[in-house]
Amino acid sequence: MPAESAIANSPHPPDHPNHRERDSVGPLEFGLKCTRLSLQLAHSLKRVGDLSAPITGEHPHLLHRRAALLQKISRALLSHLQVSIETRGNVPQRGLLVSNHVSFVDIMLLSALSPLVFVSKSEVARWPIIGPIAVKSGTLFIERQKRSDVSRINRALSSAFDAGVLACIFPEGTSSDGTGVLPFQPSLLQPAISAQLPVCPAHIRYETENGIRADDIAYFGDRNLMDCMRALIRRKKTIARVSFGSPIDAHADRKTLAAILNREVCRLGQVPHLEHQP
């Protein structure tokens, strides 16, 4: 019987504890997954080594090498976390990738699909698992409270574009619960506009094997990051669905382009635009 039919015929709703228990590993497997993940993380940090030099002005070969290494590491970590990826549309290879932001998994997810350079909020550097990898692999951390920091990040993005490396931003400026898309901040779109590079919209959604939205791994608001991580590790399998739209020419001004991209990401995910987090 298909999973959807099994759920529909069940006396319990999809989010009932009975369904969650069937979707979860036991204590022994949970411990083994944590051990395997720790070993993979240690191995990944060793592989990254000294590739943590500033991006601005560095040799293009190092940019490509670091992005490719982050891709390999992300694929290995997602495998240990038992996250499978399903895509729709074409994965971009150049320019700027713009996506909604749901979970600490997003960076691993998108980098597993294409070698790229990320812009993330500074807090990500302190996140378990992905934080140390992001720091070593050259993620650009922005202090969003400092308006002057945008200029520094935009210069680094321009360097990545000059080297032909795909870059990715999360223009909501924060992560959400995934039920909609928050307003896009336009400031980091300027380098793509100046270079007249294509900007590709994308939408991310996480589901359980039963097709239920995996909102327990959405990290937003006052949610505890460790609880979200435990939920991911405890699950037998998580499905990440990434929908890519057609590249958009960056000819408009920043605010207009941000609005166009926001509408397209909403369309890709079939979710509404949200003015604020529910």
Predicted features, each with a name:
Residues M1-R20, I73-N90, V105, S148, ...:
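Soluble, non-transmembrane catalytic domains of enzymes that act on hydrophobic metabolites at membranes
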Residues D15-T87, P132-K136, R235:
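A transmembrane-helix-recognition feature enriched in membrane-embedded lipid enzymes
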Residues L41-S52, T56, L62-L63, H80, ...:
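Catalytic core of membrane glycerolipid acyltransferases/transacylases, capturing the structured
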Residues R94-L96, T139, G164-F170, P198:
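Residue-level preference for the first positions of well-ordered beta-strands
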Residues K121, I142, F170, A202-I204:
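Generic beta-sheet signal
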Residues I129-G131, T179-K255, A259-I260, L274-E275:
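A cross-family acyltransferase "interaction/gating" segment
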Residues A160-L188:
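Catalytic-site beta-strand/loop segments enriched in glycine and acidic/polar residues
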